[in-house]
Amino acid sequence: MQVTETLSQGLKREYKVVLPAADIASRLDEQLQEMKAKVRINGFRPGKVPVAHLKRLYGRSVMLDVVQEAVNEANRKILEENNLRPAGEPRIDFDGEKEDMEKAFESTADFAFKVALEILPKFEIGGFEDIAIERFVADVPEEEVERILGRFADQNRAYEPRAEGAAAEKGDKVTIDFVGKIDGEPFEGGSGEDIDLVLGSESFIPGFEDQVIGLKVGEQRQIAVTFPEDYAAKLAGKAATFDVTVKQVAAPGEQTIDDELAKAFGYETLEAMKEQIRTTISDEYAAASRAQWKRALLDELDKKYQFELPEGLVENEFATVWRKVELDQQRSGKTFEEEGTTEEAARADYRKIAERRVRLGLLLAEIGEKAGIVVPDEEVGKALVERARAFPGQEKMIWDFYRQNPKALNEIRAPLFEDKTVDYILTQAKVTDTKVSKDELLKKAQEAEESEPAEEAVSE
């Protein structure tokens, strides 16, 4: 096998591979000899079928095996001898026409093909002491604990029917039937019977509860509302009416926050319940803080490290990103013009996102590898269990799918690897904690979550 480099440009490499006719004949004969010992053909004793006869019957299918074996061998040879790290699967192009393949099969001509691939970029990784990160943190205010306690107390609060003829007030619990319509026609999921609604809880569409206030048992009213723009795609932004019938109006009893309330929710004391609420809020703030500083860290890494990217990886990432854009548009029904842009401009913006994700993915993979970061199997297993739990009744199927598909399992491992890597970088960066309000922290976290993550482009 003769391998000659024909292109070395940036991250692109191309090679011409020639398999001499004699080599083809030898490989073909070797496989036919192996087949001879196994095949059973009427009229011939086991192991006595002439090789020439086998070649007439199976030669072309065996030739395909020979070619595949040669391709695999060439790929290994190219990567090992040139110490290359491929950025994806090599592309194989066969030279010549069908007649050339036939000549190779008859061992009267050499067999040639091309191998084209992109390699991973090489870049130097220094220390991270020059990276400065502002980390937002927030204290858990006692009023937030009390607010959540109040919500639990509301859930546990008793309601007593109001006197006959009494109108519903804010804070009352009403039992209603309703039929929702758009353009005068009922829509799927827009109707309900014997639905309990606490007026002022903001659990229904904005404007709905306010229009129920003042109604009495037995009264009907047509309520007009507009679905929020961020509602489900088929209903977002649409005007609707609801024909509402009030069946019961109940006034709230006294709200009690004591040990009995705590016991109703499985706690021994009110203080134990408060402590759990504080812990839950603290965990929520910590997760929000992490999202904020992680985004800031990735931004700094993206600015600090610039290197050539494999076009194939960028194209694949862009295709993934763009498919999501198209699906989002299908769900929302919005066009680029309605969003204040054009398809051309949107493509340019999302290509930058794809480039960022590939760059950060390659960078974090390299940093993690050099730092010796590994994700233990038990951590992957725990994450896989959590993923399976998201599909009740299909847990075993989900578990088996990931366990039998290493590429799919890497989708579970990659985010864990990324988190460990950014934690490692953070230990070396300059971090300044800044106390902010809950609202500011959650806003920053939401902005970070809405931005494009690196994790999908990361591989360990």
Swiss-Prot record:
Belongs to the FKBP-type PPIase family. Tig subfamily. SUPFAM superfamilies: FKBP-like, Triger factor/SurA peptide-binding domain-like, Trigger factor ribosome-binding domain. Consists of 3 domains; the N-terminus binds the ribosome, the middle domain has PPIase activity, while the C-terminus has intrinsic chaperone activity on its own. Its EC number is 5.2.1.8. Involved in protein export. Acts as a chaperone by maintaining the newly synthesized protein in an open conformation. Functions as a peptidyl-prolyl cis-trans isomerase. It catalyses: [protein]-peptidylproline (omega=180) = [protein]-peptidylproline (omega=0). InterPro entries: PPIase_dom_sf, PPIase_FKBP_dom, Trig_fac, Trigger_fac_C, Trigger_fac_C_sf, Trigger_fac_ribosome-bd_bac, Trigger_fac_ribosome-bd_sf, Trigger_fact/SurA_dom_sf. Transmembrane segments: none annotated. It is found in: Cytoplasm. GO terms for molecular function: peptidyl-prolyl cis-trans isomerase activity; protein folding chaperone; ribosome binding. PANTHER family: TRIGGER FACTOR CHAPERONE AND PEPTIDYL-PROLYL CIS/TRANS ISOMERASE (PTHR30560), TRIGGER FACTOR-LIKE PROTEIN TIG, CHLOROPLASTIC (PTHR30560:SF3). GO terms for cellular component: cytoplasm. This is Trigger factor. The gene is tig. Gene3D superfamilies: 3.10.50.40, Trigger factor ribosome-binding domain, Trigger factor, C-terminal domain. Keywords: Cell cycle, Cell division, Chaperone, Cytoplasm, Isomerase, Rotamase. Residues 171-255 form the PPIase FKBP-type domain. GO terms for biological process: 'de novo' cotranslational protein folding; cell division; chaperone-mediated protein folding; protein transport; protein unfolding. It comes from Beijerinckia indica subsp. indica (strain ATCC 9039 / DSM 1715 / NCIMB 8712). The keyword rRNA processing does not apply.
